[in-house]
Amino acid sequence: MKKYKAIAVPVTFTGDKPKFLTVRDRRFKDWIFVTGGCRRREIVNPIRCALRELEEETRGVISLKKGQYSDFKFIVKESPGVDLEYNVFIFFVDYTPQQQTELVRKFNDEKQKTNLKKIQKQPYKRTYDENDFMNFETLTEFNTKKQWDRIVKNVLNNPEFYACITSLNRKTFSIK
């Protein structure tokens, strides 16, 4: 059996070094790139899965509708007879340092709203509450933090990741 996953890695080159969008998983306290499972209808079009997960895991703050990307995939064994196929999408975004700061501020505002709803026992979007921090940082900064081993092994230590970041052979996407 195969399960399908997507990893969304927005990267911006505005500034001296590329900065990557990272989030911290609320449960495990690992810093990761946005990662999630694909719904059945998304399996044929995993970029939709990556974009949905990106929006959910950034609390609705980052919602990309069109742009450029490059991608690669890898497969890991979850258990005997179960493979996880990961589609990794590098999304090229043009966020200035000021915009990056503003997006992180909005993420934190949304987190406060969610926490207030929890206290008041009001309904809230559970899918928006998977990560407790969001950041734009260089890979050097990202590598100083507690990271999920699967991201390190299959993305950060994968030459395809660096080929995708530097590739000028980009694809375009546009969704409604």
Tell where the protein language model's regions lie, with residue ranges.
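Conserved Nudix-box catalytic region and its N-terminal flanking loop in Nudix hydrolases
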Residues: K17-S63
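Conserved hydrophobic/aromatic beta-strand scaffold that supports enzyme active sites
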Residues: T22, V88-I90, F136
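A short coil-to-beta-strand element that immediately follows conserved catalytic motifs
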Residues: V61-F74, L84-Y86
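Nudix hydrolase/Nudix homology domain
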Residues: R27-W31, Q98-K176
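Conserved N-terminal beta-strand and adjoining loop/helix that marks the start
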Residues: M1-L21, N87
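Short, flexible beta-strand-to-coil junctions
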Residues: F13-G15, R24-F28, G81-D83, Y95
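Residues that flank catalytic or metal-binding motifs in active/ligand-binding sites
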Residues: Y4-A6, K29, V34, E85, ...
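Phosphate/ribose-recognition catalytic cores of enzymes acting on nucleotide-derived substrates
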Residues: F91-P97
